[in-house]
Amino acid sequence: MGFRGEALASMTYVAHVTITTITQGQLHGYRVSYRDGVMEHQPKACAAVKGTQIMIENLFYNMIARRKTLQNSPDDYSKIVDLLSRFAVHHSNVSFSCRKHGAARADVHSMAASSRLDSIRSVYGVSVARNLIKIEVSDNDPSSSIFSMDGFISNSNYVAKKTTMVLFINGKWFQIIFHIIILLSMFF
């Protein structure tokens, strides 16, 4: 997935971070917690599901001004949910879950799926997934292939209140609106 370690290290300074991990073949996993950039204890053996779970709690607990802006801005949380939804679709082999503190139900929940369409179904719903057409394009020369693309587009029957485009190029998220504005500003 290309998760950058320094970003995770930075999170340990502004949130309570707990990492639980187990690899295939191990009898038990290990859990470690961080606070204020410091490991609270040595990794402890624990029961775990195969893979790595990163739990971030009490975000900005030690930065009162930033925490207050989060508490007063549902917009920040909706941006987090939107971003996690996009990554859940692109990285269909990884499970994602995000919920507000105290909420009974997750706002984003995807299981490591067998296909991208399964991830779309779990994140955006059955009606969206049912109205998608798979597209695959390549330069048709496997020996020297320099271009290939796959994805989904909605069919002409689908009507939505809001347009959602999820675009990753070479595994990197591409923020379409931001880049279109930059391109347009170069010419106009």
Regions found by a protein language model. Name each.
Residues M1-F188:
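N-terminal phosphate-binding caps/lids of nucleotide- and nucleic-acid-binding domains
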